[in-house]
Amino acid sequence: MLRKLFLFLMAVIGTVAMDAQALAPISWTAYGLTFDAPKGILVEEDTEDTFLLNSSRFYISLQSLDSEDMVQEDLNELLKGLADDDGVQEQSPIESFDLKQFHGIWLKGKAEEDPCYYACLMTKDAGSVFYISIIYNRTDDKVVEKMLKSFKMEEEM
């Protein structure tokens, strides 16, 4: 009996662990912007201004921002302002990261009771800036960081 209980618990833990990391590429068609998102997440909106995704564990929002005359040094102030405007509490210091096509920054915090990441990505040619918010529950920060580090843009032909 104890052996069956142990095997059942291991199967449940294994399923939860695999589910937490089950990511698949998804694209915002207006910009050819692709990133890894949780498998099965629903696209609520896919317009030129906004890309919204939703599941029982994640709410992901992407927006294209007016980037005219914006430089990489402007991103920290921009991100902090967006998080403050949305009432994000317990904000972490801003961290930067670098991708093949983007300069990126993020901060962690709480949106009401749920953990969240707020991020900005600027293309390395300084042509586009994207704002990303990911509100989530029942997952590991590493999954969210993996999503943020997976962004890429279709190369122009």
Could you say what each language-model-derived stretch is?
Residues 4-14:
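Sec-dependent N-terminal signal peptides
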Residues 16-22:
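Sec/Tat signal peptide C-region and signal peptidase I cleavage site
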Residues 21, 32, 38-42, 83, ...:
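Surface-exposed amphipathic alpha-helical segments
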Residues 22-26, 49-50, 99-108:
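Short, hydrophobic/aromatic-rich segments at coil-to-beta transitions
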Residues 31-76, 110, 114:
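Secretory pathway targeting signatures of secreted, lumenal, and periplasmic proteins
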Residues 46-48, 113-120, 131, 143-146:
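Short, surface-exposed coil-to-beta transition loops
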Residues 62-63, 127-136:
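Short, well-ordered beta-strand elements
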Residues 79-126:
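Signature of long, low-cysteine stretches enriched in small and polar/charged residues
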